[in-house]
Amino acid sequence: MNIKILKILVGGLFFLSLNAHLWGKQDNSFLGIGERAYKSGNYSKAASYFKKACNDGVSEGCTQLGIIYENGQGTRIDYKKALEYYKTACQADDREGCFGLGGLYDEGLGTAQNYQEAIDAYAKACVLKHPESCYNLGIIYDRKIKGNAAQAVTYYQKSCNFDMAKGCYILGTAYEKGFLEVKQSNHKAVIYYLKACRLNEGQACRALGSLFENGDAGLDEDFEVAFDYLQKACALNNSGGCASLGSMYMLGRYVKKDPQKAFNYFKQACDMGSAVSCSRMGFMYSQGDTVSKDLRKALDNYERGCDMGDEVGCFALAGMYYNMKDKENAIMIYDKGCKLGMKQACENLTKLRGY
């Protein structure tokens, strides 16, 4: 889950922000010794010294203990102990402790799920300028407690102000689509997408590419700018960016036609979960113009696309099964393509069923 992954990263890097070196001298406080033990992977020793620090009123030690117990580092996972230590740290105004506490209430770990308690903890951390907590408040008001769109926008904005790329991206999407009760504005969408893309949010770079490609950014169409943003999106492992580049090279749209480059981008996108790109690879293998003709690979890639919800992939896959005299699988896959909204799949399904 995203919150837990984020906390593991926080745990791994936490000591870096707490380094208490002075004039090159080693920090021999309980916290300092604990940090060095944690860094070296000696979690039992780290926990021992973090506990001493926590007992001495050093809130960072309490937070680090919470992280250790939550993630089961050198000990079994114990969410109740994690909750206890996060709560102690948060009461001492430690923002990471409040963030950890909010996460446990948010997820219902070690306690009953309680959005109000999560909100209280995240809100305190947000006031203490913790970007992820502001963002998580936005998520709660946006997706978990309905009817709070204005609050969601407020906290997404705070997270964006603290350079949380995902918060900026969501605001960009809200303004582009008119979500969260904001007035639709491509101009504002571009502003938020630009910041998110600068902060290496691939989805935002992809969105910018689309806006500039289609001339929807309040500016004239600018294919060079669109191409640059799509390249950045792809480099940031955004499947949509890679898929769009593949389409450009396949069709020779705004760039010199290059089927091999198209195939390479489709493969990248497919491996990142782009259903359409998997289906396009299937087509290229079935034709054999760019890569060696390989019907087995064509079938496999159509199947990947279909499994991920691409109706064209399902239609092509069903056709291959039909040509292989496998009527049962052809019917099953045409049925799936039909349910995904492909009219021709519905027509073929009716013919095969004989009614």
Swiss-Prot record:
The keyword Calcium belongs to this UniProt entry's keyword annotation: no
Major site of localization recorded for this protein: secreted
Cysteine pairings via disulfide bonds: 54-62, 90-98, 126-134, 160-168, 197-205, 234-242, 270-278, 306-314, 338-346
Keywords for the protein's UniProt record, in alphabetical order: Antibiotic resistance, Disulfide bond, Hydrolase, Repeat, Secreted, Signal, TPR repeat
Pfam families: Sel1, TPR_8
Similarity section: Belongs to the hcp beta-lactamase family.
Record-given protein name: Putative beta-lactamase HcpE
Organism in which the protein naturally occurs: Helicobacter pylori (strain J99 / ATCC 700824)
